[in-house]
Amino acid sequence: MRNSHATFSQEGSFYRPTLLKKVEKALESGDKKPIKTWSRRSMIIPNMIGLTIAVHNGRQHVPVFITDEMIGHKLGEFAPTRTYRGHAADKKAKKR
């Protein structure tokens, strides 16, 4: 039986190699600009802590500041793709 709370070291962690290169480059230069990525399925690894990664949500890039609690989660979990505008108002209740 598989543990649902497995960390990134226990299961195969996926991250886009080009994203990892951008992260390493930002760490070397000390650059604080957000790193743009379309790779929502990339897992957050300890190297990313303290960086801001702009994750694409289908429309725009959502800035996500990486903290240590996020390690092992996917980038896409922190950039919602759907906007909820509420249910349609009931016409009978509106006339009262």
From Swiss-Prot:
<dbReference type="GO" id="GO:0003735">
    <property type="term" value="F:structural constituent of ribosome"/>
</dbReference>
<keyword id="KW-0694">RNA-binding</keyword>
<comment type="function">
    <text>Protein S19 forms a complex with S13 that binds strongly to the 16S ribosomal RNA.</text>
</comment>
<dbReference type="GO" id="GO:0000028">
    <property type="term" value="P:ribosomal small subunit assembly"/>
</dbReference>
<dbReference type="Pfam" id="PF00203">
    <property type="entry name" value="Ribosomal_S19"/>
</dbReference>
<dbReference type="GO" id="GO:0015935">
    <property type="term" value="C:small ribosomal subunit"/>
</dbReference>
<dbReference type="GO" id="GO:0006412">
    <property type="term" value="P:translation"/>
</dbReference>
<dbReference type="InterPro" id="IPR023575">
    <property type="entry name" value="Ribosomal_uS19_SF"/>
</dbReference>
<keyword id="KW-0699">rRNA-binding</keyword>
<dbReference type="InterPro" id="IPR005732">
    <property type="entry name" value="Ribosomal_uS19_bac-type"/>
</dbReference>
<dbReference type="InterPro" id="IPR020934">
    <property type="entry name" value="Ribosomal_uS19_CS"/>
</dbReference>
<dbReference type="GO" id="GO:0019843">
    <property type="term" value="F:rRNA binding"/>
</dbReference>
<keyword id="KW-0687">Ribonucleoprotein</keyword>
<comment type="similarity">
    <text>Belongs to the universal ribosomal protein uS19 family.</text>
</comment>
<protein>
    <recommendedName>
        <fullName>Small ribosomal subunit protein uS19</fullName>
    </recommendedName>
</protein>
<keyword id="KW-0689">Ribosomal protein</keyword>
<dbReference type="InterPro" id="IPR002222">
    <property type="entry name" value="Ribosomal_uS19"/>
</dbReference>
<dbReference type="GO" id="GO:0005737">
    <property type="term" value="C:cytoplasm"/>
</dbReference>
